[in-house]
Every structure is written in structure tokens, then in C-alpha cells.
């Protein structure tokens, strides 16, 4: 073959490969619409973003986190194994700002030609094959992929990890959002997403910045959006249906998840979830661990007061224990824990026996506590002024515990309760802490006088540098100590900081000891 024809053949082959590549991608047009989804990029995406965000100025905190994730260099991402092939996941209840946050991040990136926004209808069962076909049409210039309501996909929990790996390994940044948080958390348990952020509630700082909300209002709402439409018993029922029941129902229907309530109707599931929430709040009001309360309820050994309260609730809501089996409640508790709607707290003093549960949504805690308080009045008891303080205390505990558990969700929570000491304590990753060390490090957080100060104490305690919690011998990463309740210890953080400083000194000694042991072993090997 002559050089001329050889070069001509080579050029044709290169063009063929180029055309084949373009056909494979089909140069994703600026707008694609299908049943239950649409995809936008370029000028079409810019127009959509500008229209959606017209008049919206305030940004949620997670928007800046998305930008940091998108702008992080591939080299930086790959430096840590935990972030290889990582995506950024957002989960949250309806109307909490997921879509708005995604579009705000796209606007701040100011690179519409490099961004692709794919939106699915949550109420339509999506097809991962359709999503893959869309993603296969991306070209090298499409660096940032935003997928809204991805949890509507059938078999999402089993397939999404492998699918996302295909694209993040090519250096693309993938940001996913989904309302069905149970499916999202289940995926993250087996396939580490990289960063999974729940935005259903806001921190007090964020709520104050974005809405001007004062602390009293924050304790009532927890920073949730649109709580006005969920007031009263009917509104509370609708909130539980919208935020929890639909979440569980969609996740179970679309994914191979085994549970005892798979065949229950929506109304029956609503009743079971509502009942579970009421039991949790009752356990905190009456200072009981949950299993013990369930035992007394299901064995029929109920106190007259509790029996009347439950009877009145059942009469109004159609809830009876004959229609809700204990196994259903236990399954719901497990799923609510996976969804981060509740957090389990074990009793350190009793070798983890006697678990308590805390609802992490202050709005739910408040509404259910007030509902129960009103039914107490219906049983003939007089209204007590301390009931308001008690409800606020439960809400404060919910705020402090849920925010701590959210930021350190991979840790284990404990409380401490013996026969003499009346405390509610939250400790994370705390198996080997001696009780004398524990008692020397209590921090008082009490709502009686200054709720905002108490809350800030809890927040500051949460933000202590994890370096102080390192333990080389036992492999413990972090220690967080929060104390809720009366104590004769000095109020404030003094005792905790003293404890942490002494603990740090032990760490230094331990590290020195390990260095000496390592040196001895090396010397022995040389000999």
C-alpha cells in the first residue's frame, strides 16, 4: 500500500473511530424528555435554572459542600481511599430544598456546558437502564452530573453503586438527591457513597441565617420547611404519611427489602408508625426504656394512666395494639433508625440493656408530645405548668442528640442511668471508658433557664477537635460526651476539657510506649 493510501486509510479510520464515539454518545442534546424524566444541559439548563431560582437568594449550607466536592481535583480525591469513585448524595423530606440546592450549585459553578441535570418524577418508577443510556451519551466535556430523585429507580439499592462507579472512575463528579432516605442509607451501608447528607432539618445556625428563626421557634419546628400545613392531629398524620410512610412504602416496593409490614395497607402502616412515635415520646416523658414500655403494653400490664392515654389516642386515630403486632413496631424502629429518623441510645451502666430511642425531628417530638399532653387532660388529669417545660426539654434533647448523631452517625450512642444517678447521657464510641472517668466528665445541659445557652454548649461540645479523642491502644477514633440533666458538677465545659486534656496526655504516653516497643522489635529482628 502506498504512503498516500496508507495515510488516507489512517485518516478514514480515525474519522470512523471519532464518528463511532460521537454516535455512542450521540452528543447529548441540550434537552431530552421521556416518561417520568427529563435531562438538560447547556443553554436549556441555564434557562431552567434562572427560571427556577428567580427570587430565591438564600442558600442551604450543603450548596457550598457540593461546590467543594465538584471543584476538588481528581488527584486530591484519589489521595484518600475513602473518596475513590465517591459521589455526593443528598436525602431529605419533600420540600426541604433538594432541587433548589442542586440548581444553586449548578448556577454557582457557572459552567452550563459542563453540567448535566437529570430529573426523575418520584412517583413514577424509574428504570436504571434508562439512566445508564443517558449517562452513556455524556461526552468528555460533561464533568458535573446532577441526578434529582434518583431513589425512584427500581432495584436502586442493588445496582446504583456499580453504575455510579463506571462514571466516577472517569473523573466525573456525580451529585445525587432522593426523597426516599431509607433506600439511600441502605445503599450507603454496603457501598460507601462518599458523602451522604440528610437535609431534612437544619442546624440552628443555618435556620437563623436563612429564615431569621429564633430559638423558641426552632425548638418547635427543628428548622423544617413548610411545617405550617402540618399543624394539629390531622396535619401530624399527613406529615408522618408524607415524610415516613411514603418513604418506607416506596423503598420496600422498589427494592428487594424484607419486612413484616410489606403487605400492610398505607393506612395500617401510618397507624403503626404513628403508634411507634407515640411510644417513643411516652418513654421519654415517663423516663422509661423502650423495651420495658413495650413489655407492659403488649402483656396488658399497663398502668391506668398509660392505658387511658393509649385508649384516647386509639379512639381518635383508630390505633389499637390488637391491629399492630410487636414485630411490626420493632421492624419500623429498625428502619426509622436506618433513615436517621430515630437514634437508639444504650444504657452504659446496664451493659447496654434497656435501650431508649430519640426522635431526631424536633417538629415531630413537639407535635406528638403536645398531642399526648392534650389526651392526658382528657383522662381527667389537670393541666400542669411543668408540662410545657417538659415538652421543651424533650425537644432540646432531640435537637442536641440528633445533631450529634447526624454528624457522627457511624458512632454508637449511650446513656447512663443507675438507681441513684438521674442522668441522660449521650456517649459515642465509648466501650472502654471507665465509669470514674465518665462521672468526672459530665457537662450540664439544662433548659430550665437558658435554652439557647444549653444548646450552644452541646454544639460546642460536638465540635471539639477529634484529635483529643484518639486512642491508639484500643483503636478508638472519637469520643463525644454530652450530659443532659441535673448534676452537682460545675456547669459548663470545664470538666470535659480537663478530661480530654488528661486523656491526650495518656495518648502521648501510649504513643511513646508503642514507639519504644516497635524499636525493640526491630532491634530483635536485626539480631
Residue ranges and their predicted role:
Residues 114-140:
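Short glycine-rich substrate-engagement loop in P-loop NTPases that contacts/grips substrate
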Residues 138-156:
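Conserved P-loop NTPase "ATPase switch" module shared by AAA+ and STAND
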Amino acid at each position: 500500500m502506498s504512503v498516500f493510501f496508507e495515510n488516507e486509510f489512517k485518516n478514514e479510520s480515525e474519522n470512523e473511530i471519532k464518528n463511532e464515539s460521537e454516535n455512542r454518545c450521540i452528543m447529548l442534546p441540550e434537552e431530552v424528555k421521556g416518561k417520568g424524566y427529563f435531562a438538560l444541559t447547556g443553554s436549556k439548563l441555564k434557562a431552567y435554572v434562572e427560571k427556577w431560582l428567580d427570587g430565591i437568594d438564600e442558600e442551604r449550607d450543603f450548596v457550598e459542600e457540593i461546590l467543594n466536592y465538584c471543584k476538588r481535583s481528581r488527584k486530591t480525591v484519589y489521595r484518600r481511599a475513602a473518596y475513590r469513585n465517591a459521589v455526593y448524595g443528598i436525602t431529605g423530606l419533600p420540600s426541604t430544598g433538594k432541587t433548589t440546592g442542586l440548581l444553586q450549585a449548578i448556577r454557582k459553578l457557572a459552567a452550563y456546558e459542563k453540567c448535566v441535570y437529570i430529573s426523575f418524577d418520584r412517583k413514577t418508577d424509574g428504570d436504571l437502564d434508562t439512566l445508564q443510556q443517558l449517562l452513556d451519551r455524556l461526552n468528555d466535556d460533561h464533568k458535573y452530573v446532577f441526578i434529582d430523585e434518583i431513589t425512584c429507580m427500581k432495584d436502586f439499592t442493588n445496582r446504583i453503586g456499580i453504575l455510579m462507579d463506571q462514571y466516577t472512575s472517569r473523573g466525573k463528579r456525580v451529585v445525587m438527591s432522593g426523597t426516599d432516605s431509607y433506600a439511600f442509607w441502605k445503599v450507603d451501608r454496603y457501598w460507601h457513597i462518599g458523602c451522604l447528607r440528610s437535609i431534612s432539618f437544619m442546624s440552628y445556625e443555618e435556620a437563623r441565617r436563612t429564615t431569621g428563626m429564633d430559638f423558641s421557634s426552632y425548638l418547635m419546628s427543628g428548622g423544617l420547611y413548610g411545617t405550617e400545613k402540618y399543624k394539629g392531629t390531622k396535619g401530624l398524620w399527613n406529615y408522618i404519611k408524607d415524610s415516613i410512610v411514603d418513604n418506607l412504602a416506596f423503598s420496600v416496593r422498589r427494592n428487594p427489602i424484607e419486612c413484616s409490614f410489606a403487605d400492610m395497607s398505607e393506612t395500617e402502616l401510618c397507624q403503626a408508625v404513628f403508634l411507634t412515635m407515640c411510644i417513643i415520646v411516652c418513654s421519654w416523658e415517663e423516663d422509661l426504656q423502650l423495651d420495658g414500655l413495650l413489655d407492659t403494653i403488649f402483656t396488658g400490664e399497663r398502668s391506668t394512666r398509660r392505658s387511658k392515654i393509649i385508649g384516647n389516642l386509639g379512639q381518635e386515630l383508630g390505633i389499637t395494639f390488637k391491629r399492630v403486632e410487636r414485630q411490626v413496631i420493632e421492624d419500623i424502629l429498625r428502619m426509622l433508625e436506618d433513615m436517621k429518623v430515630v437514634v437508639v441510645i444504650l444504657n452504659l451502666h446496664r451493659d447496654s440493656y434497656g435501650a431508649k430511642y430519640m426522635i431526631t425531628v424536633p417538629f415531630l417530638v413537639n407535635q406528638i408530645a403536645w398531642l399526648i399532653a392534650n389526651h392526658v387532660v382528657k383522662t381527667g388529669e389537670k393541666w400542669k405548668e411543668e408540662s410545657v417545660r417538659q415538652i421543651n426539654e424533650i425537644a432540646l434533647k432531640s435537637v442536641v442528640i440528633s445533631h450529634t448523631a447526624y454528624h457522627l452517625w457511624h458512632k454508637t450512642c449511650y446513656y447512663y442511668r443507675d438507681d441513684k444517678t438521674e442522668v441522660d447521657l449521650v456517649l459515642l464510641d465509648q466501650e472502654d471508658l471507665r465509669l470514674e472517668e465518665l462521672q468526672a466528665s459530665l457537662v450540664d445541659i439544662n433548659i430550665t433557664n437558658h435554652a439557647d445557652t444549653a444548646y450552644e454548649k452541646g454544639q460546642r461540645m460536638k465540635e471539639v477537635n477529634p484529635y483529643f479523642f484518639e486512642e491508639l491502644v484500643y483503636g478508638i477514633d472519637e469520643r463525644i460526651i454530652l450530659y443532659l440533666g441535673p448534676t452537682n458538677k460545675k456547669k459548663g465545659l470545664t470538666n470535659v476539657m480537663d478530661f480530654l486534656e488528661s486523656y491526650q496526655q495518656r495518648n502521648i504516653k501510649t504513643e511513646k510506649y508503642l514507639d519504644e516497643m516497635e524499636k525493640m522489635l526491630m532491634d530483635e529482628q536485626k539480631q
